[in-house]
Amino acid sequence: MYKVFRIIMLSVMLCLCASPAWSQSNATKITWNGHAAFGITTPKGKVLMIDPWLRNPSNPAAKNKHDPVDDIKKTDYILITHGHFDHVGDSVELAKKTGARLVTNYELGTNMAKLLGYPKDQMGFDTLINIGGTITIADGEVTVHMTPAIHSSGLQIPNAGPNEPDIVYGGTAAGFVIKIKNGPTIYDTGDTAYFSDMKLIGRHYHPDIALINIGGHFGMEPDMAVMAAEAVKARYVIPHHYATFPVLTQDPTPFAKAIKKHHMTPVVMKPGETVTYEDGKLK
């Protein structure tokens, strides 16, 4: 009788472990690779890379002549907010290595394929959008909304000839709202300046996490970034786009202190650090 009971219990446990509800994690992982480069791994294991300038000087994986692109084994989608070199970054090499599809505006995607060699078959109307547009990717697990940004978007051509322009049209700069099933809603501002309609982004999408540029000079100064965070009202605020170059803000501490006064939680990450969002909490 005892043996029969053990067999029944073992069978029940095996069934539970095999069921999606038991085995599937609801954890979303966010890695900051320095500057504006983020990696997101969804609960189902899809990998999104945002503005993947992995070789930036803040990334510890780029130290001592090590190539951080070598460390990336999987990328399903590359999301690019605008055409500047520090956001296009290493996307072409990453795409050729992993087969990642490109999510960006149509003009930038087209020129990246023609002038930089991004594989043309790794983009299309399923991934190229414009401000106000929405796409669903990752087998329905991820929804991406392209939001406005006040910034420029020239695409730099490294091998331009003497009679050719060094910078070509890269569409309109943008931000992204990324909704992940069984995970967070993440708003990445891109390099935008503050604009009052950020309140509408917060009101409409209710982001759990905001990735906000604070570096100044080429984007929002920290005090303006605080206004942006207050407008969006995300529960967690992660600063980025700082301390990469001397002209940028070096210390995020004053920004983090101001965010606390607005009853939000600042999450100041170190380059290379990964945080996990699970059960409504970022840790």
Residue ranges and their predicted role:
Residues Y2-V47, L54-N56, K63, T147-H151, ...:
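Zn-dependent metallo-beta-lactamase
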Residues Q24-T28, T42-L48, T134-V144, K179-I186, ...:
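Beta-strand-turn-beta hairpins that frame and shape the catalytic cleft
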Residues P43-F85, G89-K96, L116-K120, S153-V168, ...:
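Pre-active-site segment of Zn-dependent metallo-hydrolases
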Residues M49-R55, I131-I135, E141-S153, A193-Y194, ...:
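Conserved catalytic scaffold of divalent metal-dependent phosphoesterases
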Residues I50-D51, T75-G83, V103-Y106, I186-T192, ...:
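Active-site neighborhood of phospho(di)ester-bond hydrolases with catalytic His/Asp-centered motifs
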Residues L102, L116-A138, V226, E230-K283:
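Binuclear metal-ion centers of metallo-dependent hydrolases, dominated by the metallo-beta-lactamase
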Residues I157-A231:
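Active-site-proximal loop/helix segments of hydrolase catalytic cores
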